[in-house]
Amino acid sequence: MITGLLKKVFGSRNERLIKQYRRTVAQINALEPKFEQLSDDELRGMTEAFRQRHAGGESLEALLPEAFAVCREASKRVMKMRHFDVQLIGGMVLNDNKIAEMRTGEGKTLTATLAVYLNAITGKGVHVVTVNDYLAQRDAEWMGRLYNFLGLSVGVNLSQMAHDQKQAAYNADITYGTNNEFGFDYLRDNMVYDPSQRVQRPLHYAIVDEVDSILIDEARTPLIISGQAENQTDLYQRMNGIPKLLERQIGEEKADGTGVEKPGDYYVDEKGHQVYLTEAGHEKAEEILSQLGLIGEGESLYAPQNITLMHHLYAALRAHSLFHRDQHYVVQNDEVVIVDEFTGRLMTGRRWSDGLHQAVEAKEGVTVQQENQTLATVTFQNYFRMYEKLAGMTGTADTEAYEFQEIYGLEVVVIPTNRPTQRKDLQDQIYKTGKERYDAVVRDIRDCYERGQPVLVGTTSIETSEYLSGLLDREQLPHQVLNAKQHAREAEIVAQAGRPKMITIATNMAGRGTDIVLGGNVEKQAGFIEADPNLSDADKAARIQQLKDEWQSLHEQVKAAGGLHIVGTERHESRRIDNQLRGRAGRQGDPGSSRFYLSLDDQLLRIFAGDRVRAIMERLKMPEGEPIEAGIVTRSIESAQRKVEGRNFDIRKQLLQYDDVANDQRKEIYKLRNDVLEANDVGEMVANLRESVLIELFRDHVPADTMEEQWNIAGLETRLREDWGLEVPLAKTIEGAQSIEDEELLNLIMKAATERYESKVAMVGRESFAGFERSVMLQSIDTHWREHLAALDHLRQGIHLRGYAQKDPKQEYKRESFELFARLLDVIKNEVTRVTFNVQIQSPEELEQASEQIEEGLSHLENVQYKHDEFAEGREPVEEAPSPRTGTAMAAAELALAGMPKVGRNDPCPCGSGKKFKQCHGKLS
């Protein structure tokens, strides 16, 4: 009550904002006579003048009145359209990073030109985001005339465009495109192997058309790029024979050389679920691979071109030694199906990763399938929040104002209409059954048809629209059906839906973005006349005038019949969608009417109010075909809609809280990746990684601030020799010195490592080696990031169960995903260091060839799919079900899910590094 009183005295916030904007409108209007005096060239020259003033430090806000006045004058000359005062207000709202709610027919497309022009002055690029390719192309061509007149370039970003066309589109001052394409381009730019392959510039300013559709209806749906890596099924089958030719070692060698009961080629650590090749095993494996023709004679497994073979060999060894049929998996219908070790149930659709599933398939002789992998993913919520400035416009945003403010920080400003609205919104009519409802709809349509009044019938599904079309066919009522599939044809039909006696059936979203003009739209026909080379200018003018006169007659005829009549066949769960349908009628002060016909069988009524309304109907003994038409029922339906909207908002907000965790990690990984791409020499980065890894290794064996007696020098020398190929006489150095600091030993190791590294670089040259290092780093980041995405997905699947243990699932997810991310960075660091340090080089050509192979292997992805599907619970799995991964990130996820920790401190780390858990990932725990 007090709030209502204050609003009456001071006005609502919306009214106060509009009042402020009207002051600026007065300034713009005062400038109009001045700019009318300028020639076309002088008007065009204002753009460059604005650019220089902005470069000199003048803000866009200071330039706004003049820039808007220039844009309006250019529109009068080029488009023959003058911006209304309310459109100037809309332009200011868009420039202030807000959402402009403008009724259908109030000219949103023209309004956007004001804010687009002003922000394009900066030269940083403006993106205008639409819901489909047709609207992007239409608006770019339509408004492009205005921008080109003012000296600005315009690009269109469409799917299936060539790479150079995309780059040109993004380098234009203004770029039109769809939300999907902007999002996918962002993901693709973060998968390139050369900075010149990127298409997007830094994200500066975006205006999102139909902002409610893109930022709310599609907010739960992530964009996903998935694909199949290079087909290596033959390699898995050839590798499958190798484990049978190798001997298994019994017992693990200890630091003092004891512990081995029977020597062999590989050791199986059943506790850590890992397999390791011994030194003898490496030599034997190289011999076998050479005989199979997989590596050259005398070549090492660690040669650059053979690095990926190690991965396949270990997968085959694990498949044979650790995974047993009818225990870990079963074979059904030519497929390997995983068995859940805790429940014993079959996990149909799930696959191990890292090539393990394929190795088991090869072992069992079933068809080896290629694996689909999520390569990159982002939600619209997180993509659009990356823009420096973001604004939007729609006909219906006020009902979702809280969500726009809460999630995107965007305030909704309702722009007044240019002329008062004359549409009559009639009371809903509620029938007992669907049949009675459709009979009433057909009666209403026939009545309008006979009076010459055009009708637009809105349905919630394609099925309903086709059923209704069948009823109208039976009644011999001519009509058009739109199902939101053919956007271009759809726009033409919608544009003519205002002609007398027109009946148009459309699903709610069909034809959105196209106005329904009473009497039909003559612009297209006028365009054909203008383009006819056989007509003189006088003939063209006469024919166009004749068209306009005919249109005026039809326009008056339709107005007299009551304007466009909207028939809703069902209430949507969102009031916003209902308002969009209603908003089709009564554009720019035209007359119009709307009515919804409901039945107790409708989902919304059935769930929320059906029983209550049915009881009223039965008490009143209402005859068949007689509707209820009462304000109390309509209000209870709106109350039900508010409940559903609230529930959907909670779901979207919760999903965003989970996705924000992945988003922060995505930003970090993409930043690291871009640093690697743009670095002149990655040698310094690799040197820092190497130093970090060696310090960690050293501190595992020689802890800081400890006595000499506590140092494990023998273990350290063994690790340096086996993992790094470094012979550093640490024990002899200690024996020969009276006293020695641990830092001196560390310096010895660093010196030996640097000398070995420099000798490799000297063999091939700094430039060649830097190229190889860059490829290895990118390969490691990309491979492990893809695994990490699957690990996060897997963690997300079961995290809600933590609630039963009185823990907050969101906090648990944050904590454990951070641990996973820390491990991911650790694994990348170790892998890059190990590969670049141990690579065996013969010539620069060999190294360059290896770099090319690495990049080709990563970029050669078959069956790449761009997904953006509707789904209910959150993230749509790329595969039928999320893949349990066996890589490092997944090993950690499995541990986390099982409640952490399962690995003993002295057990080998599940990441496969060969170190003890306490000396590897155990430190992170």
Swiss-Prot record:
GO molecular function: ATP binding; metal ion binding; protein-exporting ATPase activity
Its membrane topology: Peripheral membrane protein
Biological process per Gene Ontology, one example term: intracellular protein transmembrane transport
Classification via Gene3D superfamilies: Helical scaffold and wing domains of SecA (1.10.3060.10), P-loop containing nucleotide triphosphate hydrolases (3.40.50.300), SecA, preprotein cross-linking domain (3.90.1440.10)
UniProt catalytic activity: ATP + H2O + cellular proteinSide 1 = ADP + phosphate + cellular proteinSide 2
UniProtKB keywords: ATP-binding, Cell inner membrane, Cell membrane, Cytoplasm, Membrane, Metal-binding, Nucleotide-binding, Protein transport, Translocase, Translocation, Transport, Zinc
Location relative to the cell: Cell inner membrane; Cytoplasm
EC number, as in UniProt: 7.4.2.8
Gene Ontology CC annotations of this record: cell envelope Sec protein transport complex; cytosol; plasma membrane
Cofactor(s) the protein needs: Zn(2+)
Residues engaged in binding Zn(2+): C909, C911, C920, H921
Residues bound to ATP: Q87, G105, E106, G107, K108, T109, D515
Cofactor note: May bind 1 zinc ion per subunit.
Summary of the function given for this chain in its UniProt record: Part of the Sec protein translocase complex. Interacts with the SecYEG preprotein conducting channel. Has a central role in coupling the hydrolysis of ATP to the transfer of proteins into and across the cell membrane, serving both as a receptor for the preprotein-SecB complex and as an ATP-driven molecular motor driving the stepwise translocation of polypeptide chains across the membrane.
Family assignment from sequence similarity: Belongs to the SecA family.
Subunit note: Monomer and homodimer. Part of the essential Sec protein translocation apparatus which comprises SecA, SecYEG and auxiliary proteins SecDF-YajC and YidC.
Protein name, entry field: Protein translocase subunit SecA
Organism taxonomic ancestry: Bacteria, Pseudomonadati, Pseudomonadota, Betaproteobacteria, Burkholderiales
